[in-house]
Amino acid sequence: WAVIFDMRRGTMGVVEYRGYSVLMSVYHKEKPEYLKQAIESIQTQTLSTNDFVLVCDGPLNESLDSVIAAKQQEMGKTLNVVRLAKNGGLGNALNEGIKYCKNELVARMDSDDIAYPDRCEKQIAVFNTHSEVSICSGIVEEFTTDPNTVDTKRVPPETNAEIVEFAKKRNPFNHPCVMYKKSAVEAVGSYQDFYLLEDYYLWLRMLMAGYQGYNIQEPLLHMRAGSDMYLRRAGWKYAKTQARLFKFMRDSGFIGNSQYIKSCVIRSGSALAPNWLRKFMFEKVLRK
C-alpha cells in the first residue's frame, strides 16, 4: 500500500496536515455495543477521517461482524477492514494495521473507548503548529459504566522535556488517544512484542531516537477502564516484563542504575502484591 500524504504546504513552507488515519483493533471478546460506540465517536468527529483501518485480530463472532457490516454500509471505502487469520495480540494487530494506513498522521483508538468530538481536530492543530512533534496524546477520563461519571483522570506530562523525564519512571503517553507520525513509528521498528507494554516500549525507542512528543492538557477520550483493571497488571509474567523494560532503559543509558533498581522494586512490588494492596496502589499512587 502506498502512503497517501494528505497535506499541503502552508506559509513559510511549513507542512500542513489535513487528513488522518484511524487505527483500531478488535477481537472476539469485545462487546458489540462498545465497538459500535467507539466507531461512532470517530464518525462524529468535528474533523472527519478519510481512512479508518479496523483490524480484526483473529475470527470474531456474528454480533461483532454484524456491527462491522453495518458500519461498512455507512462509511463505504473510508472503513478498511483488515482480517487476521488468528489472534496474535494487540502489538501484532497494530503492526499489521499501520501498513494499511494511508496518511502520515495516525490516530489510535481502542474498540471500547469513546473519543471526544473534537479530539482529532485538537491533535491535528498541534501537528500543524509544532512541526517538531511526532507523537501527541492528552488527558483521558476513565469510567466504569457511564462516560459522564468520571472515576479518575490520567493526566500526562505536557512538554517534551517533561515527557522524557516522566518516561524514566512511567508511561508518558495515553495510548488510547495517541496520534503519531507513521514515518516516525516505522523508523524505530513499530510495535514489538512486549507483554502489556508494547506502547511504552515504542515510546521509549522514539524518544531515544530524538522524536519529540507533546500532551494536550485537555480531555480527549472517555476510557472504559473497569473496576478490575488492577487485576490485569499482576503476576510474575508482568513483573518480569517490567523489569526487562527498565533493564532496556538502563542498558541504553536512558536511566542510571539507581533508578533501575528503584523502579524494579516499586513495580515488581505492585505486580506481586495482594489484590487489595495493589488496588490501593493502583488507585491512589500509580494512577496519579
Specify the residue positions occupied by each region the protein language model found.
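Short aromatic/hydrophobic "clamp" motif used to bind/position activated sugar donors
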Residues: V106
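Short, flexible, basic/aromatic active-site loop/helix in glycosyltransferases
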Residues: I139, K153-N171
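Glycine-rich, basic loop-to-helix element that forms the pyrophosphate-binding segment
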Residues: L84-C101, K122
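Catalytic core of nucleotide-sugar-dependent glycosyltransferases
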Residues: M223, L231-G256
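Short, well-formed alpha-helical segments that are part of the catalytic scaffolds
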Residues: K29-T44, N50
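Acidic donor-binding loop at a coil-to-helix junction in glycosyltransferase catalytic cores
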Residues: Y195-L204
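Conserved donor NDP-sugar-binding/catalytic core segment of glycosyltransferases
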Residues: D118-D151
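Catalytic beta-strand/loop signature of glycosyltransferases that borders the donor
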Residues: I139, G213-L220
